[in-house]
Design a protein with these regions (language model features):
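N-terminal small/polar loop signature for handling phosphorylated ligands or for N-terminal nucleophile
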Residues: 1-56, 65-66
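A glycine/threonine-rich phosphate-anchoring loop and its flanking beta-alpha core
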Residues: 53-124
Length: 124
């Protein structure tokens, strides 16, 4: 098994991070996405997973969710409990070049499995 990492996902994930993740998935024939972090990491992973199965710019999928026809399987390990992203089909992505922040949703972006160790949330 080969593992590829997309690190440095900031709060309010940016479309640039999504594009980088999609490129990583396509160039390396990645077949699943594991998000380890909080809601921003999981939101980014969801759109990366959908974008990896789409031929255009992943921003298209943010502003036009009906174009999401499939996504790579998504799994999450939640380290910060706050947004509910680990159990839903929604994601919020920002494009700072346009000063826009959009929500998108698709059943294809719902994580297949999520793990939560409550000890990670004691300090929240």
């Amino acid at each position: 098994m080969e593992i590829f990492e997309l690190s440095g996902i900031a709060p309010n994930p940016k479309i640039e991070s999504v594009r980088e993740g999609v490129k990583l998935c396509k160039e390396n024939s990645i077949d699943m996405v594991l998000a380890i972090g909080g809601g921003s990491v999981i939101d980014c992973a969801k759109v990366v997973a959908a974008g990896a199965c789409y031929d255009g710019d992943p921003w298209d999928l943010v502003i036009t969710p009906r174009w999401i026809k499939k996504a790579l399987p998504i799994y999450s390990v939640l380290t910060l409990s706050a947004t509910g992203s680990e159990m839903d089909k929604f994601a919020v992505i920002s494009d700072m070049s346009k000063n826009e922040k959009w929500g998108t949703a698709s059943d294809h972006m719902k994580p297949k499995m999520s793990i939560l160790d409550p000890e990670y949330t004691y300090s929240v």
